[in-house]
From Swiss-Prot:
Top-rank taxon, per record: Viruses
Keywords: Lipoprotein, Myristate
Lipid attachment points (N-myristoyl glycine): 2
Family listed: Belongs to the mimivirus R683/R861 family.
Official protein name in the record: Uncharacterized protein L683
Length: 222
């Protein structure tokens, strides 16, 4: 991933860190929803520009959009790694001669059909990845919205009884404190097929040449 937030999805990377126990955050739907909205706007903007072969102000606006995502991630997570990304973006925006910008598309690159298709595959996959990550959050929100005292009590009683009989039961109480645990459970059901599913969805949307697909796979998909 480039310093200014190239694909893969930053929302997905955040949730992946939580799933892999690299981050321990308090569940906050408002932050996660806003990150999703900003990042989807970023992906939509880049994909539209690549399709139209339009590079006018492309790089500057792209970096500005990703800067908004990074600032919100820093505010939510307090992770100073995001501050480094923010500083890198700000430097790029103020530098007259930026070195190796992460998403600097030129007209020459976009005139080549294969290169353009690879960019579309990359960013469309990132957008689909962002949508999938948000779908996990939405499932958790539905669970949390259905909570009431009676429901929780019944679930708790049922769990205590079944735990006594079957000690191996993997149970997660439905409550805000366990929101990310619920999300992880949902992801575990998808783990073995989600990457392949997102790849197929991306290829169906972009409809690239076989050459572009082969090169895309060789670059590695996160």
């Amino acid at each position: 991933m480039g310093s200014c937030g190239n694909s893969p999805s930053l929302l997905w990377l955040l949730l992946a860190d939580i799933i892999n126990k690299k981050k321990d955050l308090v569940y906050n739907f408002d932050y996660l929803q806003k990150i999703h909205e900003l990042e989807m706007n970023y992906f939509d903007f880049v994909i539209e520009k690549v399709r139209l072969k339009d590079t006018d102000n492309h790089v500057k606006i792209t970096v500005e959009k990703m800067l908004d995502v990074l600032k919100l991630l820093l505010e939510y997570t307090q992770d100073q790694n995001y501050q480094k990304e923010i500083d890198s973006c700000k430097k790029y925006l103020t530098d007259d001669n930026p070195v190796n910008p992460s998403d600097d598309l030129t007209e020459d690159m976009l005139e080549d059909d294969t290169s353009r298709e690879i960019y579309l595959l990359e960013f469309t996959y990132g957008r689909n990845q962002c949508q999938y990550a948000y779908s996990l959050i939405q499932k958790v929100e539905i669970e949390l919205a259905n909570i009431n005292t009676l429901y929780s009590t019944v679930r708790s009683m049922f769990y205590n009884t079944m735990k006594y009989i079957f000690s191996s039961i993997d149970y997660v109480e439905v409550c805000p404190e366990n929101a990310f645990k619920l999300m992880i459970n949902y992801y575990e059901n998808d783990r073995n097929h989600i990457a392949h599913s997102l790849q197929r969805k991306t290829i169906k949307e972009v409809r690239p040449s076989q050459q572009a697909i082969t090169m895309w796979f060789n670059f590695g998909i996160y």
